[in-house]
Amino acid sequence: MRADLVSPSSAHLSYAIRDIVKFGELVRQHGLDITWENIGDPVAKGEPIEPWIRQIYHDVVDRDESWGYCPTEGFREAQEALAAHVNERPGARISPADIIFFNGVADAVAKVYGFLSPHARIIGPSPAYSTHSSAESAHCALPHITYDLDPNNGWLPDLEDLRHKIQTYPSIAGILIINPNNPTGAVYPVEVLEKIVALAREFGLFLIADEIYIHMVYPGVETAHLSEVALDVPAIVMRGISKELPWPGSRCGWIEVLNRSLDQNFSAYVDSLIAAKRLEVCSTSGPQLAVPRVFGDSRYAVHLSRRAQMFAARAEEAYKALSSVRGIKVHKAQGAFYMTVLFEPGALNGKNQLPIASPGLRDVVERQCKGAAPDWCFVYRLLGSRGICVVPLTGFYTPHPGFRFTLLETDDAKRAWIFRTLAEALAEYLITGEVAA
């Protein structure tokens, strides 16, 4: 071509959650059934949709307006309903105009980072969720700036590290919070959120909160919506229905803009997001019309409570199966539907192995491991040996080796097998390293 077509930003795009699928498919071609524990799709794992939620969408499809375009920011009735839900809580007040719909939270992420000045940086947590870290890196063609989540403190934010990074990098304009956290399953106490808000206030930053899992906090765990604690700091909260209905195929998400009037530059930035959305005309219309009816139904609170209890029980199952394995650290999830296993220092030494019956598949796996990070090698060998697909933790923009798995399997016996097999494979892998050493 007469000109280079490839953006330098493309080098910063990675998504380990899907990247591992390509290798999993290669393993499957060698005759091994694959159990996919890499992606957070409850529907794909067999969770049934509540009949009353299905009926609401059936009714929506019968409305002519669900087949056409909607206003760029979203249907007014959906905006009004969501703004009312925010205003039912103590804290920041918003208007319907502060709700802007996108085609899923991922679309919101792309716009929020894509229309920032390339000189304005957003610091995010590490481990990071790949959609955020890649989008932030790509918008400026630079490595993502992160603050540590402490594995020795329940994966909570290291606030001293956050303060240090803010002071070190004057280009930082905003702080990203993911609560409940993906990939760790941690949920941030109110006082932690308040301290992050205080840092934003002190340094003149805005906040981004990914709250896609905020209605999936387990019983007995206390947290808050950002709108409840960010009373005087401009912020963008990202929400959606992919996880909590669940309806990931709807691609229906939105942002809540908090305290827009406090800063003229922030307000102009929000205007640019709307202008960018206007170029696409609008977001998917049908699911928007379902949101007010689902969220306003008296059965919805029961639905959310049931699912939170269900995932809390599964987290307990996983913790019991894995916590006794030597050489790893496991934090029991407090929200969302993921858990993370962390390898302790020295546990991975290049000598670890898992048996793979097929010589051909073993060769494929070992070729894949050449030059790969140690936790990626474990994931490849786990796939070849046991047929379970998980995501390497270093794929989440962190130096900590480990892996993430889901709590989504609906078949009780199979879920028990998954957790038991993970524990057995880990024990075997780490023991072979000790013997070889």
For each feature predicted by the language model, list its residue ranges.
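PLP-dependent class I/II
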Residues: M1-E73, E77, A83-A437
